[in-house]
Amino acid sequence: MFKLISQDIDTIKKEFIKQSLFNRFVKQTDENNHNWGILLNEKEKRARIAPIYDLDCCCESGTLRKKVRTTSDGSKYDFGAFFRDFGDKKWFNKYVEEVIEDFDINKAIQNAKTETGIEIPTEIKEHYKNFFGERFYEFKGAYQKILTEEIDKEQQNEVR
């Protein structure tokens, strides 16, 4: 074991926001204080919080109906509300743009097979391709809408 060094509180907050966005992306229905763990990186001598997933409670495959964390407007899965809550942070916008640029569900499925050696059954692959394809479309559309709203606000302020 090793002694953990102090971590920057700002970094922990950013990671938590990113993980909360991911939970929203996968429609996590079992988000609670018990579903978090600590990952230790012995090489870098650091730790970070990480979500723990019950696979039957995300990607619309589960039946649990528990309380899900909401955004300031009370929504559970709407990306627009999440973007409005955190869109004033430059690092957050950069992160979202990287997600949009790098998203490739087919590559993720292939990487899963390469890393685990397990072939995902066709019907399950199709479910995830459809689910993540739809969520990505909603994600990207909501982000573009927020950007357009921000540009419109700036233009209105310039006119005044």
Where are these regions (language model features)?
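Conserved kinase catalytic-core segment
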Residues: M1-L64
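C-terminal catalytic region of ATP-dependent kinase domains
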Residues: E42-R160
